Amino acid sequence: MADTEKSLQSLDPIPVDVLFEIFLNLPAKFLARFVCVSKLWAKIIRNQDFIRSFSFRSFRENKQHRLLFAFKNQIKGYQENWYFFSKSTHVSTPLYEPNSLVLPDQNINKFEALVGEEPPDFESSTVCHLKKMRYQNPSYVHGLISFLYGEEQIICNPSIGKSINLPTLGSSETIIGSFLGYDPIHAQYKVLCLNKSSLQFCGHQVLTLGAQNCSWRMIQCPTPHYPGTTSVCIDGVLYYSASRGFTMHEPLNLVRFDLRTESLEIASVFPEDFKSSVKPSLINYRGKVAVFSKYFCGDFGLWVLEDAKKQQWSKEQRISIRRGVIGRLPQGLQILGTSDMGEVIFAPNYF
């Protein structure tokens, strides 16, 4: 036994560049485990060069674009169980036998009834044990999902079902908006948090995920404002709607936050003829920020910001959902964004 241990210790360690290549060809769920094996392995996997190479390899090899579905099941109090699924956006797959597949949540079986296809592939699940209610819809940016429950913020990786809790703000501060963004140049995720206290109308703090000093830092905002809709991140820039007054009844503005320079500015005022029966939705429309308005009876309007300096918006079109589809979805539809092909993605408000 002693001879065996000595022979193992005498073996030359695997070169770092070889480990780098080995890890590149492994699934993400194994890498999540390997960070606990040794400090060297964790250092390689968390290295920014490795993260960029792994992301590029995954994108290149994944020839089929996929949609991510998230379903929640509230157990008790404010505890939520989240289930994540993915589905190819290519040619529809054949119908399946309803009893041939068992899913974690019975509500998922309604997917087949809605679209007439087999349900998506199960990815992972995660449980959120929180003390307060979630007032903001989760946001999805470059593979990560952000949740906000009162003053508690959670970032989840749906590919592996792992999540982390972000550091809390001061006890006297109330979060009124939290937005997740991704900077593709430096391969960094950042969270922009808007809060109010007795000392200020609206403060702005930023946190960089994965930084050695993972703490909130204050940034300056030249124009005080109150956040409105959820955000959209395009090429390292976060956009969200806001009002310069205390309520969202004031004229709406489009706020721009550059993740690289961490600068905030009012990018534009919403179009004069913009009207909506619900809060507007911001999406990435062919590389430009766009806003959707919802009318009644399944009609939607789309405005695209063509030139922020000239305050130039173009109204692309008015989209009408077929009455037959609306009749099957009495709970209504919401706009989630667009696919890589520029297709607008709608989803039921509730399943």
Curated annotation (Swiss-Prot):
InterPro entries membership = F-box-assoc_dom_typ3 (IPR013187), F-box-assoc_interact_dom (IPR017451), F-box-like_dom_sf (IPR036047), F-box_dom (IPR001810)
Q: Which residues form the F-box domain?
A: 8-54
Q: Which Pfam families match?
A: F-box (PF00646), FBA_3 (PF08268)
Q: Give the superkingdom in one word.
A: Eukaryota
Query: Can you say what this protein is called?
Result: F-box protein At1g47810
